[in-house]
Structures are given as C-alpha cells and as structure tokens.
UniProtKB/Swiss-Prot annotation:
<dbReference type="Pfam" id="PF15477">
    <property type="entry name" value="SMAP"/>
</dbReference>
<feature type="compositionally biased region" description="Basic and acidic residues">
    <location>
        <begin position="340"/>
        <end position="357"/>
    </location>
</feature>
<feature type="compositionally biased region" description="Basic residues">
    <location>
        <begin position="265"/>
        <end position="274"/>
    </location>
</feature>
<feature type="cross-link" description="Glycyl lysine isopeptide (Lys-Gly) (interchain with G-Cter in SUMO2)">
    <location>
        <position position="462"/>
    </location>
</feature>
<feature type="cross-link" description="Glycyl lysine isopeptide (Lys-Gly) (interchain with G-Cter in SUMO2)">
    <location>
        <position position="373"/>
    </location>
</feature>
<keyword id="KW-0597">Phosphoprotein</keyword>
<feature type="cross-link" description="Glycyl lysine isopeptide (Lys-Gly) (interchain with G-Cter in SUMO2); alternate">
    <location>
        <position position="250"/>
    </location>
</feature>
<feature type="modified residue" description="Phosphoserine">
    <location>
        <position position="59"/>
    </location>
</feature>
<feature type="modified residue" description="Phosphoserine">
    <location>
        <position position="142"/>
    </location>
</feature>
<feature type="compositionally biased region" description="Basic residues">
    <location>
        <begin position="17"/>
        <end position="27"/>
    </location>
</feature>
<feature type="modified residue" description="Phosphoserine">
    <location>
        <position position="51"/>
    </location>
</feature>
<feature type="cross-link" description="Glycyl lysine isopeptide (Lys-Gly) (interchain with G-Cter in SUMO2)">
    <location>
        <position position="309"/>
    </location>
</feature>
<feature type="cross-link" description="Glycyl lysine isopeptide (Lys-Gly) (interchain with G-Cter in SUMO1); alternate">
    <location>
        <position position="250"/>
    </location>
</feature>
<feature type="compositionally biased region" description="Polar residues">
    <location>
        <begin position="54"/>
        <end position="63"/>
    </location>
</feature>
<comment type="subunit">
    <text>Interacts with ZNF106.</text>
</comment>
<feature type="region of interest" description="Disordered">
    <location>
        <begin position="258"/>
        <end position="314"/>
    </location>
</feature>
<feature type="cross-link" description="Glycyl lysine isopeptide (Lys-Gly) (interchain with G-Cter in SUMO2)">
    <location>
        <position position="140"/>
    </location>
</feature>
Amino acid sequence: MVSKTQKADLGPQLPEKKKKKKKKKRVVANVSEPETQYSVLNSNDYFIDASPPRATSPSNNVDEVQIPEISLSKRKKKKKSCSTHLEECLGAEPTRARQKKSPSPRRQALEQSAEGLIREKKKKRRKSLSKAASQGSGLKTSPDPKHAKEVSKAGRKSKKQRKEKKVPDTEALPPQDAWLYEAGDSLHSCLEGAEAEEQAALGQKRKQGSPRDHNMKKKKKTHQEGDILLVNSRVSVENSLKKGSKKSVKSEALEFVPIDSPKAPGKKKVKSKKKVEQPVGEGLAVKRKKKKKKRKENGVKEDPWQEEKEESDTDLEVVLEKKGNMDETCIDQVRRKALQEEIDRESGKTEASEPKKWTVGLSVKTEASEPKKWTGTQFGQWDTAGFENEEQKLKFLKLMGGFKHLSPSFSRPPSMTIRSNMALDKKSSEMLQQSLQQDYDRAMSWKYSHGAGLGFNSEARKVFYIDRNASKSIKLQD
C-alpha cells in the first residue's frame, strides 16, 4: 500500500516543476495585487473546493488525507507568520509618513531596502502557494461527511499549534527564509531606533527652546518694554502738563500784582509805553497847528470838513503814520477839489454848476440853507436802469433783494432821470421792451393740441393715437 501511494504521489509531482517555472514569471507581473491573493488563501475552504473529484479506493483516500493535513498545518503557520509581519510593516509605514512628511536620505535608503525584502518574501509565498495548489489538485475530496469533519479537526489543531509554538515555526522554515526574516526584523528595529532617536532629539530641542521661540520671547520682551516706556512717557507728560499749569497760574498771579507792591514788572512796562505815546500825540497836534498857520499866511482857504476831521483825530491815538506822495512837497488842495468835481460830474452824482466861493465863517449856514443833493443808491448796476414809475422801480429793487436795511421812502429828483453813464437810452430801452413783449405773446399763442403727453393739453371728445404708424396702436377716448 505504501509503495502504491508513493508511486501515485510521484506521478503528479513531476510535471509540477514545470508549472513552478511558469508561475514565477506570472508572479512578477502580478505584484500589485497582494491583497486579493491573501484573502483567497486565508480562507480554509480554498483547498477543499479547488481540487476536482476523482474516484479511488477508500484505502487510498485515508492515506492521502493524512499526508496533506500535516502539510496544510505547516503552510498555514508560515502564511500567518508572514502575513502578521507584513501587516506590522505596512502599519508602521503610514505612521512614519504622518510623523515625517519629508524623510531624510538615510531613511529613504532604509525604506528602499525594506521594500526589496518585502518583494522577495512575496515571491517566496507565491511559490509555496503554487506548490500547495498543485498538491491540492492531486488530492481527492470525498463526498462523505466524515472526511469533511476530519479536515475541519485538522484545521483546528493547526490553529492551536500556532498559538503554542511560535518559536519553532522559524526553525521549520528553510535557512534562506529564516535569514530573510531576521534581516527584516533587524531593519525594522533599526528604523524604529532611528525614529526614537530623532523624536528624542526633537523633544530636547523643544525643551531647550528653538531659535524661533527665542526670537518670539525676545519680541514679547521688547513689546513689553516698549509698552512700559510708553506708559512712563505718558505719566511724565501728564506730570509735566500739571507742572506747566501750576507754573502758568503762578505767572498769571505774578502779572496781576497790586501797584503798591515793590515788584510790579508788568505795570512798569505799560507805564513806559504810555509815556512814550504821549509825546507822539503832542507832536501831531503841534504839526497840525503849524500847518494851519502856514495856510493862513499863504491865503489858502481851508475846508470846514477837514477842520472837523482834524478835531476828531485828536481823540484818536496814532500808532503808525505812513507818509504819502513824497514827490509833491506842497499838497495843492485846490487842484484836488477840481479833480473830485470832474469825477462827480462824469458819474452823474452832481450837476455841472458854477464854481462857488467859500468863506470859512459862512460855510455852515450856506450848506444848511441849500437842499441835500442825491448821492445815488447802493444797488450797483441797477441804479442805471430806467423805470417809468417810481413804484415799478421799488418793486423791482425789492424783488432783487433791495431795501432790507434801508427805508424805501427816498425818491430820486425828476432832474436826475437822465444820466450820461446809463446803459440804454429811453428810445433803445422802449424798443427792447417791445421786442420782448412780442416774443412773449408769440410763445403764449402756440397751440398745445399738436401732440399728446406731458406739456400738451389734449382736446376733449377726440380720439388720438399713441403711434399712428403702428398697426396695433391703442385708441384712447376721453
């Protein structure tokens, strides 16, 4: 029986070597799909359903069932140990990526070597899986429920063995696989040690205080010092203001010292100024007296208005006196009067009258006896406008804003209706008024019934169109 089973087992094992070579090539292409393969392999029913049924004797069935049970348990142990190691590596990688986004070149080299080891492990696993698949294809699945129970029991035993024997699993592996696992573990430990060192260094730096933190502390200190200085400066300014106010009060108090006190500097200055000003006024009065004497000696007649002005000027105190035209050594009063009369004639304020003889004694009586002459209003250019009636003139001036502060009782004399400097004569003004009236009448005589809308009065009981050219115009009736 043993010989037959061995022969039966050797038969299907020969072509398996060829299949291994073919599957090696496939493994390189399918590296990017490790998760799907593991999910299929981890299921316990894979080897049971994959192999097609084959009719053999019951004695052969028993021997064949006992052989794969042992091999399955060993393979499952290998798969579990590899898968757990891979999951640890894959779980460690994302945590490292989170901790450090920009790894150092040393770390990159270590990661590359770890990736190479992982790829080699994957290849070896696929080889072992291919062997298991080939052996499973040679096995027979018995339709009896007893056979299924035996397989499930073997699976449970293998799980218990995995928990109890973790160390002997590495011994059961071939020497190359063991060396690879040890190298991977050493790399993983090295990486973890390097990360721990870097984290420790970062912690020390944080404890010591980075240069940025130091700069921030310095800035905060400077800001605090600046705030303290500002507060001190404000306090000092307020104190100085208070002191200044006290000093000003003292100075004001000193200025208002009574006259009896021995120290009165302000009053002394005022007195000296008054003393200086007094001789100036006396000097002016002396000069005026001298001028009067000179005029009497020369026989020049003096105006009463000038005398009054001179008398009123005595009350005023002259601070500064500017000299006028220095070219004329002697001011000719007669010439000045003649020039003023010519200006008045041209402006229309006074009529052309014969030169009058003035006497100093009778000047006041003659002026009182003569009626006051019209000196013109203060309305500027509207004084030159000619009006037919006095009422019309008053209305116009009121409309223009006149007589707000003056009484409208004054009237122009009839002789002053015509003046030389008027803008228009009577004839030209009449022509202008006629033309304006014609324009006004023409504008008012226009017919407003030509159109419709704002500004047009539509005739009642008539139909009109908004738009005659439009076909769909609306008819409106009143």
